């Protein structure tokens, strides 16, 4: 028997840690291992301790925990053809974009304010809008201030890797536990198509020479991080016709050098963003092309499939950016940190994630044991917590799962414009949603109206709210059983 539903949304909307814990305890916990680590059986305990509350390094954790980025590092030492940094932009959702640059003191003020209001917060990252290692003094000063005030928060940086080797020892000394390196090539001939120039050793390099230096520094930095036990995630931008097939080789190289995760992301090439690739017509991959590459990389370095390509000032759960709520004009001038609400939230999560893991593993095993050749591509509307708990019309993205002979796995997400605006459905938005759901067999959501349901059906996509508020994997297992006539894994409520 599973635990009664505890709504994470209602918990995080409470005003005090006491209310949060009272709500959690009223829900109870039926799992015999309530409060344990929920560690996957295929992972050692030391690694699990590092990732269990890091939403970017753990697909399971991203259902429960939030990250925030502080824009303290605007300077950059390379130019990428897919990047155009903007420092006062509120309406673009992509890396390299922020609403405002921060000093280390302003960053501390903002982090404390967010930690007091967002109990899911577990990670502070510096991801630009330039490069965290090149703009090192600001990165270091920010981490030192935050670690002194909120010692339990995980510290994380994202870097292009060019200046990484000279700072690895200091990163280890400051207990920076996770580092992301963007590596798009291991062949300089490919790299020169992506990077017009780099700035290294007080001079500018171009062409193959630039790409060769960048490659060597990236590999050295990765090896140094691995040797010091710092977990690394490799980000790669999939650029059709430039490096798409080459990323298979990149995956091999980074796995050999100890990368924990490889995150292959689609190129964002909207001309309105002003990037070189966008302005010259270089297209990004569609969702099916990205999935095909992900499938080819199975068996190599472990893949991250839940990346949202966040802004450099993102705040909140992945897929739910609350950054505009916490610009400097919205946060107190001198906030005082109170960790009680964050601690209470962690106790809540400990009560429910074991139940989720038990249901998830049972569902995956049930689908795999059915040994059915067919597969289902399922899009899910969710607010987090591992449940189908979002109204179709309110969804800003759909998480995509595949049920097949190997079980159930998360394979990506599709961003959309919400169908409902002010209580009314928008036909243009629905057309965009249907296009975004290309290749999907069925949509699972908490609620859906007859009109969008019928329009989806006309496009060959079924939708149902039958499994509303069930755990995602358990619902997919039950759905799979219905589709293929096998014994179901009972969906949990």
From Swiss-Prot:
It comes from Sinorhizobium fredii (strain NBRC 101917 / NGR234). NCBIfam families: nifB. InterPro entries: Aldolase_TIM (IPR013785), Di-Nase_FeMo-co_biosynth (IPR003731), DiNase_FeMo-co_biosyn_sf (IPR036105), MoaA_NifB_PqqE_Fe-S-bd_CS (IPR000385), Nase_CF_NifB (IPR005980), NifB_C (IPR034165), rSAM (IPR007197). Binds 3 [4Fe-4S] clusters per monomer. One cluster is coordinated with 3 cysteines and an exchangeable S-adenosyl-L-methionine. The two others probably act as substrate. Residues 62-311 form the Radical SAM core domain. Involved in the biosynthesis of the iron-molybdenum cofactor (FeMo-co or M-cluster) found in the dinitrogenase enzyme of the nitrogenase complex in nitrogen-fixing microorganisms. NifB catalyzes the crucial step of radical SAM-dependent carbide insertion that occurs concomitant with the insertion of a 9th sulfur and the rearrangement/coupling of two [4Fe-4S] clusters into a [8Fe-9S-C] cluster, the precursor to the M-cluster. Disulfide bonds: none annotated. S-adenosyl-L-methionine binds at residues 82, 130, 182, 234. This is FeMo cofactor biosynthesis protein NifB. Pfam families: Nitro_FeMo-Co, Radical_SAM. One of its GO terms (molecular function) is metal ion binding. One of its GO terms (biological process) is nitrogen fixation. Pathway: Cofactor biosynthesis; Fe-Mo cofactor biosynthesis. The gene is nifB.
